[in-house]
Amino acid sequence: MAEIPTKLPYTTLRAFLTPILLLAFRPKVKGLRHVPATGPCILASNHLSFSDSIFMPLVVPRKVTYLAKSEYFTAPGAKGLIQKLTFIALGQVPVDRSGGRRSEAALLTGLKILAEGDCLGIYPEGTRSPDGRLYKGRTGIARLAMESGAPVIPVAMFNTHQIQPTGKLIPKIKRVRMEFGEPMYFTGDSTDMN
């Protein structure tokens, strides 16, 4: 199971970046009141851009921990080191998405985050949308919700694929929009999903 990073780098990076990014990208946010102030919750968002994991924590008033593909933590060279340190500072946890037992380890990591009363950010599609459309989600989020009892807050991200298209390092300055929906609760036995 992956080790969950400490909150100090996250808090420091957030304090530094938030004023700059809020001023530059002027996020328009609806429904933020649906994110509980305490206790476990799952923020389930569409995934349009690398920058989704940066913009959402800017507006959510509590720490959001994401499950991120392990390749972000293992790239070689100076760029790889900077990328790894940035992802750790952003509160992201590396997970191997290759399937089987590795996928199980990712779910257990998510359950540990929720058991600690934290907020878990997840992209149900499992990867970025190549064209801005919403694709079929995977079942891991349902399992996390049913096994933890945590509410799922649906989140819609808009414009981030235009701000930072796949493969682009430098984002364009454009207004980002986010909408948080009402919490959803799921019950049942997650073993029935197989």
Go through each PLM region and give its residues.
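Short, basic, glycine/proline-bearing loop/turn elements
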Residues: 16-18, 89-97, 124-127
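Short gly/ser/thr-rich secondary-structure transition/capping motifs
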Residues: 22-30, 102-104, 160-162
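A cross-family acyltransferase "interaction/gating" segment
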Residues: 35, 130-192
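Hydrophobic/aromatic ligand-binding patch that stacks against planar heteroaromatic rings
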Residues: 55-56, 86, 112, 143-147
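Catalytic-site beta-strand/loop segments enriched in glycine and acidic/polar residues
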Residues: 111-141
